[in-house]
Regions:
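Periplasmic c-type cytochrome electron-transfer domains
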Residues: 1-209
Length: 209
């Protein structure tokens, strides 16, 4: 008859936060205008497609970043905000690599420029840790209309489910680290360099944690 005769729902060991939120990552019919794109189109399996996209909006205006963090330090001196003023966010930001969704629970202002610290869900001044990763991710609700072309705003309850799901995505373990967590001499030197910043924390007067 080419028809479904019966539908049985099987039990799942997955937590509701996973079941409810995963749909928002993959369901293009719910998240976009015509069902051709979802968040997972670029954030493949919650990670990255390794592509740089130019998603600037020429019709938008320059906005201000509430954080006092010196984002030019993260770029090793280049101006990631366009005007040279690290407190301004120019709408034409140029091509930027898709960032991973893994391990976001320990982040605050999201995006390469930290611009998601500001949005319809509120503002995180991000002056010092702990930063509000949940608020910053909730501000991505605008992307469903601006990037995916959704005809109307995503319901706040859906965005909350997506936020809870995404912040639960963990980064995978280091595949080359020893099982006993011991470090080779080269790895130990790299760890000391990374945690000590080797003087880089004084370049712009902003501490690096």
């Amino acid at each position: 008859s080419r028809r479904e005769r019966q539908h049985l729902r099987l039990s799942s060991p997955e937590a509701p936060v996973i079941v409810d939120g995963r749909r928002l990552l993959y369901d293009a019919t719910h998240s976009s205008s015509n069902g051709e794109a979802s968040c997972a189109s670029c954030h493949v399996f919650g990670h990255t497609d390794q592509l740089a996209w130019d998603l600037g909006n020429p019709d938008a205006g320059v906005t201000r970043l509430p954080s006092s963090i010196k984002f030019n330090l993260a770029a090793l001196g280049s101006n990631v905000n366009g005007t040279g003023n690290v407190g301004e966010l120019h709408p034409l930001k140029g091509p930027m690599l898709t960032q991973t969704l893994r391990g976001l629970a320990y982040h605050g202002p999201m995006h390469w420029r930290g611009d998601r610290a500001v949005g319809v869900s509120g503002t995180d001044p991000a002056t010092e840790p702990p930063f509000d990763a949940s608020l910053s991710f909730m501000n991505f609700i605008a992307a469903f209309e601006e990037l995916l072309g959704r005809a109307e705003p995503l319901p706040t309850a859906d965005m909350r489910a997506f936020t809870d799901f995404s912040l639960a995505i963990a980064a995978p373990p280091n595949p080359i680290r020893a099982l006993d967590n011991s470090l080779t001499p080269a790895q130990a030197r790299g760890r000391r360099f990374f945690l000590g910043c080797d003087g880089l924390d004084t370049r712009s007067g902003a501490p690096v944690d």
